[in-house]
């Protein structure tokens, strides 16, 4: 028998965290940051206190109180560590989990509202995702500020500063960053991808852990997991079909039909329908823009055509504004700028990505 616990992403945009359990084993379907909840307490230059580790996110309700799965080095040292979980054990969402029973995180894509809090999970818990998503996650971390919330692919393990329990980051000369295990579906990593994975532009050295390759599916304890590419604004997005305990779970992550890979989303839908003919199916579906729309969505091709019509006649500076990490939209404007003889100016982190 399978058990599903929705820990985030319900009644909100993003923050997806789903716990799937069966036969003493567990998987997470995404482990993201809730932008709305985080935005109630923090902003760009006001973030959780690094010396307090996971205490601030737990206390603010940004992390579910799941004892046993978070990084030990982000839990206060000394006496504070002994009493950390006492305050949460009476909360309704509290669970105690054995990290060794967690076979991994199935991460649908690299947007932080689906992947961001992988950073605080125990570093022995592997991430299963597509090769492209893994590389994008690393590129995002390479070009982001250095703090524990950004440490999805590799992490600097903290240590207690003193008996107060406060944490500190060891100097780069004393401790390399530790890489989390990643298992990728789909394409076999090229040597360029492997080389990129094993390096970091930071001054702190990296203790690399090679990418593992799963092909099209993986057996994780009692679960059979299959990964399907889907259309989304960031490369590498995928949906998952998980079978076990006489049940199938289709998890869409974020998906759409109106981009350049809409046919991939259609293929995932057909695979889920086929699974539903064999087994009872639970569908966990993205619903941010669900609803009746007689006009249908505007396709990315239509966006490109309308933008080009404007850009051809515009004089002076043209400013294009769209969401961060929307690489498809970025490449559209790069192509259009070249087409009309304009120069595209972007941030260094976008160029790195």
Q: Where are the language model's segments positioned?
A:
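A contiguous, basic/glycine-rich beta-loop/short-helix subdomain that forms a polymer-engagement track
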Residues: 347-353
